[in-house]
Amino acid sequence: MRNNKTPFLSAIFTALIRGYQRFFSAFTFSSCRFYPTCSNYALWLLYFENPLSAMGKIAIRILSCNPFCSGGIAYPTTRLKRPSLLQSHKDFNRNFKTITFWLVPTTKSHATYYIIKV
């Protein structure tokens, strides 16, 4: 489910955001009005989506994080194809990994999911 189409571009954007978190955001007071913070929102989207489409969602999020917005809880969303039960069972037995994200369906169609970090 991880975005593997453009790993180089994702790695560059991820490194920039992690640098911002470590060197700039660490020395300022917490002022993000949302949960997850805008930088975590960006990292989660870059993990699951194409970097170019993720940048559009990230830009909208950053523009909405201003003093005139009430903020709140706003998890990122992504569109994914649901794997078949047989395929997911085979993958589960072969390479079990630690669960890091929950994908919670937003609608009954199960095409759009909220990304929630465990």
Curated annotation (Swiss-Prot):
UniProt superkingdom: Bacteria
Transmembrane segments: none
Compartments in which it is found: Cell inner membrane
Major place of residence: membrane
InterPro entries for the chain: Membr_insert_effic_factor_YidD
Keywords, sorted A to Z: Cell inner membrane, Cell membrane, Membrane
Membrane-protein topology: Peripheral membrane protein
A GO term from the CC aspect: plasma membrane
Cell membrane as UniProt keyword: yes
NCBIfam families per record: membrane protein insertion efficiency factor YidD
Protein purpose: Could be involved in insertion of integral membrane proteins into the membrane.
Family: Belongs to the UPF0161 family.
The name this protein goes by in its record: Putative membrane protein insertion efficiency factor
